[in-house]
Amino acid sequence: GDPTFCGETCRVIPVCTYSAALGCTCDDRSDGLCKRN
């Protein structure tokens, strides 16, 4: 289904910090939100 928003944004720096440990990556195509597929 759709990627899950991880509650972290990555607009300023395109890197997810704390949610990266949860398997989340920066989806720069959708307002810079960290998402997990």
UniProtKB/Swiss-Prot annotation:
Disulfide bonds join C6-C24, C10-C26, C16-C34. Coiled coil: none annotated. GO terms for biological process: defense response. The keyword Cytoplasm does not apply. InterPro entries: Cyclotide, Cyclotide_sf. There is a cross-link at G1-N37 (Cyclopeptide (Gly-Asn)). This is a cyclic peptide. It comes from the Eukaryota. Keywords: Disulfide bond, Knottin, Plant defense. The presence of a 'disulfide through disulfide knot' structurally defines this protein as a knottin. Belongs to the cyclotide family. Probably participates in a plant defense mechanism. Inhibits the cytopathic effects of the human immunodeficiency virus. This is Palicourein.
